[in-house]
Structures are given as C-alpha cells and as structure tokens.
C-alpha cells in the first residue's frame, strides 16, 4: 500500500505538503480535516530525536493516529541519528515515505536499501552545507531527494539560495527522482524552487499562520502555476538576493518549536 501512496504523490506533483510541526496538536483531528478540505494531497511529518538535531518532536503514536483518520500519504522526515532503528516501527505505524539524513549515517546506499526493503518509498535528505556527492551512492535506490533550504533542527533561519543550485543540478542529472524542498517555503520562494526543479514543497507557517488554509493553498498554487508558465506571481522576478534577505520566510524548519 505504501508504494501505491508514493505513486499518488508522484501523480500530484507539483504538490504542497503541509508540515504538521506547526499544527495545533490539541486539535489534531480538526487540523487534519481542515488541511484535507483545503486541498492537501499528502502530509509531511518532521520526526526529531533531540540528538541529531536539538529539538524533540513526535513519534510513532502520531503517525499511527493520522493513519487511522486519513488516507493521505504520510511523508515522514527522520531527523534522527539512527534512522534504521525507527524505520520499521514507522512503517508499522503507517508511514508511506521515509526520508533519512545523509549526515546521520555512514553508508547512505546501505540505509536506503534497507528502508526500501520495508516496502515504502525512500528518500535521502541533505543540509545546505552538505555536498551532493554525499548522497550520490544512494541515488540509484531512492525515490526522493529532500533538499533542505535551512539547516535541519535550528530556528530563526532564512531561506538559503544554495538549495536552488542543488535542485537545478539534481534535476539535470536525475530527471526521474522526486525532488522535495523544506525550509522557508512561502509565496515568494515556492516559485524559484519550482523553476529550479522541485516537485514537492514542504510548507509550515505560510499555511498554519494564515486564518484560512484554503486561501493559503490557493496562493501557493498560483505561485506554482506562475513558475510553470516561466513567470512570477507579481510580474517581476524574485532574485536569490531577495530570498537570502529573508523575504516571506513561510518556513517549516526555521520555525521549529524550541
């Protein structure tokens, strides 16, 4: 079933994936209903262990609860030091796609292969300062590459335009791999990320800090449509300098709870 959900994600691209890190956990079922009504086609979950990154978030019970109440694909981002120790339990809980960090493991190809053997989609993530060469051994075995546009697990960061360069290189070399971007994605940054080659866009505050999730999805969708037309939403090009200055943070990882 998980591989079928992966194909659903492929069919939905370009797609906005709300990051549940900023949702109201006191009303998780209500948040799920609102996101589904707004047009979410998959959900992104940032799992942090307090070790690989300083913050601590949620684990298998949240994934299991979401699975009971939703058929949406669950995209689980493992920001943890030992991803293989949690991979099986996460799959049992209902994860459809598991992404681990290249910086957390010694052998990216081995870890990717073991996760794939669990019958789910597999992704590999890299932080802004990590070179693409660090993930190359895993690329034949992964379905997705997650390009971080902020450092995983640290707050108060602006969108790092080096992510756009990595996306462009990956798209040129690996046209069939799903490319996902996470960190500082909002109305101003989603277009350049799309033009650089991203398929999936993890969005936090640009959704959850808006009173109407449907309007947030509509605005982000318009920016994606403009990017696909080779234009920008407001008739002018958004430069990497503007992005680097922190315009429209709309972040997920940069707003992680301390």
Predicted regions and their residues:
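N-terminal amphipathic alpha-helix/helix-capping segment at the start of soluble metabolic enzymes
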Residues: 1-22, 29
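Structural motif
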Residues: 38, 69, 93, 118, ...
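Conserved, mostly hydrophobic/aromatic
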Residues: 28, 46, 90, 145, ...
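Conserved anion-binding
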Residues: 85-89, 95-173, 178
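Alpha-helix-loop-beta-strand connector modules within alpha/beta enzyme cores
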Residues: 56-76, 114-123, 163-179, 220-227
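Hydrophobic faces of well-ordered beta-strands that scaffold small-molecule active sites
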Residues: 16-20, 43-45, 74-78, 98-100, ...
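Glycine-rich, proline-tolerant flexible connector loops at the mouths of alpha/beta enzymes
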Residues: 43-60, 150-156
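C-terminal helical cap(s) of enzyme catalytic domains, especially alpha/beta-barrels
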Residues: 194, 209-230
């Amino acid at each position: 079933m998980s591989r079928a959900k992966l194909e659903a994600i492929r069919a939905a691209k370009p797609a906005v994936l709300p990051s549940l890190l900023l949702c109201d956990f006191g009303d998780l079922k209500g948040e799920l209903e609102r996101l589904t009504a707004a047009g979410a086609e998959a959900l992104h979950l940032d799992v942090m262990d307090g070790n690989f990154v300083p913050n601590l978030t949620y684990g298998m019970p949240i994934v299991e609860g979401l699975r009971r109440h939703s058929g949406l694909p669950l995209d689980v981002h493992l920001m943890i030091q030992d991803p293989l120790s949690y991979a099986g339990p996460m799959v049992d809980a209902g994860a459809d796609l598991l992404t681990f960090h290249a910086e957390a493991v010694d052998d990216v190809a081995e870890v990717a292969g073991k996760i794939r053997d669990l019958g789910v989609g597999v992704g590999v993530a890299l932080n802004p300062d990590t070179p693409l060469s660090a993930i190359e051994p895993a690329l034949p075995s992964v379905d997705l590459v997650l390009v971080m546009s902020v450092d995983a697990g640290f707050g108060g960061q602006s969108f790092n335009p080096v992510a756009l360069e990595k996306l462009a290189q990956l798209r040129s070399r690996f046209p069939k791999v799903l490319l996902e971007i996470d960190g500082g994605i909002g109305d101003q940054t989603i277009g350049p990320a799309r033009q650089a080659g991203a398929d999936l866009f993890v969005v936090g505050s640009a959704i959850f800090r808006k009173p109407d999730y449907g309007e947030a999805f509509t605005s982000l969708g318009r920016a994606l449509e403009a990017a696909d037309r080779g234009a920008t939403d407001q008739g002018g090009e958004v430069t990497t300098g503007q992005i680097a200055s922190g315009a429209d943070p709309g972040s997920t990882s940069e707003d992680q709870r301390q």
